[in-house]
Amino acid sequence: MAAVPLRPCRASGRFLPLLRGGARSRGASPWAAGPGRVAQRRYKKDVLPEPGGAAPAVSVTEIRRYLRAQGIPFQDGYSCLHAPSLFGPELPPAAGPPFTLFIDKTTGSFLCTATLAEGGWQDLQAAVELRHRGVPAPGPDEGEREEEEEAEARRAREDARRIWERALPLGELLDEEETRATKAAFGIAPLADGTLKRFGVRYLRAAKALVFPWFAPRDAALRGLKLLVAEQRGDAVSYTEETLPRFDAYRNLFGLPLIGRRDAEVVLTGSELDALALHQATGVPCLALPRGATILPPALLPYLEQFRRVTLWLGDDLRSWEASKLFARKLNPKRCSLVQPGDLQPRPLEALNRGLNLTKILRAALPAGHKAIVSFRQLREEVFGELANSEQVAGVKWARFPELNKLLKGHRRGELTVFTGPTGSGKTTFISEYALDLCTQGVCTLWGSFEINNIRLAKIMLTQFATRRLEDQLELYDEWADRFEDLPLYFMTFHGQQNIKTVLDTMQHAVYMYDITHVVVDNLQFMMGHEQLSADRLAAQDFIVGAFRKFATDNTCHITLVIHPRKEDDEKELQTASIFGSAKASQEADNVLILQDRKLTTGPGKRYLQVSKNRFDGDVGVFPLEFSKASLTFSSYGKSKAKLKKVKEEKGPSPKKGPSGGVGGSSKP
């Protein structure tokens, strides 16, 4: 039985109506909310950097130098430096494991696995200073967490405990027939009851959901849950999941309590069911990442330090494969192997259902570290994978802009897109919907809005997300804000002129911390400011465009760069040459998009999106956009189908419409 992969955009609390106690309040559980619980409104989207300024950069050399200067012993690990804990009583060396403090080599952030104390590099320095003065460092519960945050965490733990007590092990259901029917519904018929019991999996009848526990590694206390609901779609099973606490605070490495201290090998999977199937078939230690192929939180790296070999088997599509390569960078590629998706190498649960040899698939995993020079023999399988999965190679498809899919084919990592349009044409409004479309499909997005502030941008995006004017329906605000908050969306707090190095450092930090794969910079001129002379300004712009191009390539991250056009005659259509500055921007770009306003003469106020450059396969063309003021959307989402016109990429006058105003001929360069 085939399985449809999970999508990172979760439907918060909407699939468990039987367990709701009323309308969902902010921070309250949708399963155990009782009557009389006061609704709280809180909108808080992640922003980068912290309000105090850019994230402080620290190198591993500086960290080592500081530890030596303070007389703190340490060992070099794969992703972290290991040191004795500073957050408990000083113990003699033989009293327990001495190195329980893990310091991230990239960011300097730390986690003490003995006390669960965590923080940034500056917090660690402060703890060292307190230690030298004889003052105990604050424990994990004595930090400066917001009162509302603490209350929300307590509610989540209490709600998780209630659900856990109501759930039953599958082996304790009424009869074998109910157990078989439940397993069949989730596509896990081959999984033995013993495997499910070993991992602590339970079943919640009221919601028809599997329950996966999150136990604290220190004291085995229940910290949260993940609930999984299955839906039959033909021969396939589609899964929807929900977590307590909410998704961005859920850091459960499912299967961690079963890992022994001497285990030196582990397989990371994209779902709990895959971990169960793989462990049953091979006996190899397996862990499921809490957010699948979407993100590997750096806070989990300390728990993976003990393993000399890490195999990533995250799924059966190209996005999982790309995520595996990205995660291997964090984990240290030298110890990582990757299972490449293919017909004979599907996700572990499907492989078990099909009777494939999972041990053989693991042995065929490819090393993540590449040499500087390779032969075609080493690339052969990857080339075949791209040919066999051409639709996935084309990238993530837009749901709101199907016409854009016909031209660009999809949104791909590692590319640079330049977007321009006349002043006042709605560039920010369009590009926010363009990016939101991808974000709702699990593309981790970082916004750098240098022209308008984040509150105004978030208001635009929330309106587009809800496709309605929330000003007139404030009673729906909490519901839509809850859903919007679950998106993998982050904002830089910069506004106006900024130094390019500071911006790039923040982007690099976001890629590492949140596995960002799409960065939107709106816009280049506002980021640069107006201080330089005209000649210096053009050179500075070329340098910045080149820096963004290099960043996109080095980090396998797509950058969408909004640039104002030159001042030209309003009656003329914009062209690729209309982009402000030298030709550097259009030369470096993989894609050039132009928002045309009233230029293709089908009526006043009409706008068109023109693809004037497409390096992926050369298709260029134009299609109309219709703006809805109520929902602030340009897409044909729920509207009549827009007409697409493909054109040849050549110099000369713009294509003219046919006699009927319909679609003209199409051709490919």
From Swiss-Prot:
Keyword presence, Isomerase: yes
Gene Ontology molecular function, alphabetical: 5'-3' DNA helicase activity; ATP binding; ATP hydrolysis activity; DNA helicase activity; lipid binding; single-stranded DNA binding
Region feature (N-terminal region (NTR)): 54-214
Extent of the transit peptide: 1-43
Residue spans of biased composition, Gly residues class: 659-669
Catalytic activity line of the entry: ATP + H2O = ADP + phosphate + H(+); Couples ATP hydrolysis with the unwinding of duplex DNA at the replication fork by translocating in the 5'-3' direction. This creates two antiparallel DNA single strands (ssDNA). The leading ssDNA polymer is the template for DNA polymerase III holoenzyme which synthesizes a continuous strand
Signal sequence coordinates: none
Keyword Membrane: yes
Membrane topology field: Peripheral membrane protein
Domain SF4 helicase: 390-641
Coiled coil: 141-167
InterPro entries membership: DNA_helicase_DnaB-like_C (IPR007694), P-loop_NTPase (IPR027417), TOPRIM_DnaG/twinkle (IPR034154), Twinkle-like (IPR027032)
Region called Contributes to single strand DNA binding activity, residue ranges: 2-120
Role: Mitochondrial helicase involved in mtDNA replication and repair. Might have a role in mtDNA repair. Has DNA strand separation activity needed to form a processive replication fork for leading strand synthesis which is catalyzed by the formation of a replisome complex with POLG and mtSDB. Preferentially unwinds DNA substrates with pre-existing 5'-and 3'- single-stranded tails but is also active on a 5'- flap substrate. Can dissociate the invading strand of immobile or mobile D-loop DNA structures irrespective of the single strand polarity of the third strand.
Domain note: N-terminus enhances protein stability and hexamer formation, which is important for DNA binding, and is required for DNA helicase activity and, ultimately, for mtDNA replisome processivity.
Protein name: Twinkle mtDNA helicase
Organism per entry: Gallus gallus
Source organism phylogeny: Eukaryota, Metazoa, Chordata, Craniata, Vertebrata
